[in-house]
Amino acid sequence: MAVGKNKRLSKGKKGLKKRVQDPFSRKDEYLVKAPSTFAVRDVGKTIVNRTTGLKNANDSLKGRIFEVSLADLQNDQAHSFRKIKLRVDEVQGKNCLTNFHGMDFTSDKLRSLVRKWQSLIEANVTVKTTDDYLVRLFAIAFTKRRSFQVKKTTYARSSQIRAIRKKMVEIIQREASSRTLTQLTKLVPEVIGREIEKATRGIYPLQNVHIRKVKLLKQPKFDLGGLLALHGEASTDDKGQKVEREFTEQVLESV
């Protein structure tokens, strides 16, 4: 006969049941702020463990990267296929001040652009901006039918593709190397693509010309003043103002 423990006979509780603590009770919420170049500044909220001992909450927040749709940042659904990466560089109070970290296309948009009977032309350029950011820009373009064309296909010759790629590289280098990173983020969505389309019209007509990706390779030494100016929080006058006040000599009543 097997001898086992009778579950009906309990000897009593050995100890009280441990109290389960809510993990979110030890966390704080911080507001993520986008640079002033975007129409919408409030990106969202992020949580982090509260500062305890040597573990500082600010250190945990710095370097976090958030991926946000450009349509939400600009209140324009035409940019819904562009994803902007923002990196936390500074924490002030309950606000996380971010800077541009990169841009990419959604996978469904890229797949919708690739079609039959046309040539795909790609180019990538590594450029240093005027404020010493090293970025790599990836461009994409597709050939389209001419107005008088009867043939169904729009394949470009190898020599034409090389000439178009050369023009793409020249335009991207010219536009990116003469501007700051902030100015470049404004040009990336539409302006550079239109410039490429206009310049290559004589070689072969193009359509769907975009900067599909921007990758940040290297950034300069962190500048707090520059970041605050980017967020519109830097004071216009850094110098103190002189206060006009009459000098009154204090007389000691007792020595």
UniProtKB/Swiss-Prot annotation:
Region (Disordered): 1-20
One record GO biological process: translation
PANTHER family named in the record: 40S RIBOSOMAL PROTEIN S3A (PTHR11830)
Biased composition (Basic residues): 1-18
Entry's localization field: Cytoplasm
Subunit structure: Component of the small ribosomal subunit. Mature ribosomes consist of a small (40S) and a large (60S) subunit. The 40S subunit contains about 33 different proteins and 1 molecule of RNA (18S). The 60S subunit contains about 49 different proteins and 3 molecules of RNA (25S, 5.8S and 5S).
Protein name per Swiss-Prot or TrEMBL: Small ribosomal subunit protein eS1
One Pfam match: Ribosomal_S3Ae
GO terms under cellular component: cytosolic small ribosomal subunit
The keyword S-adenosyl-L-methionine appears for this protein: no
Organism of provenance: Coccidioides immitis (strain RS)
N-acetylalanine modification, residue list: A2
Recorded family membership: Belongs to the eukaryotic ribosomal protein eS1 family.
Keyword flag Cytoplasm: yes
Single GO molecular function: structural constituent of ribosome
UniProt-listed SMART domains: Ribosomal_S3Ae
Keywords: Acetylation, Cytoplasm, Ribonucleoprotein, Ribosomal protein
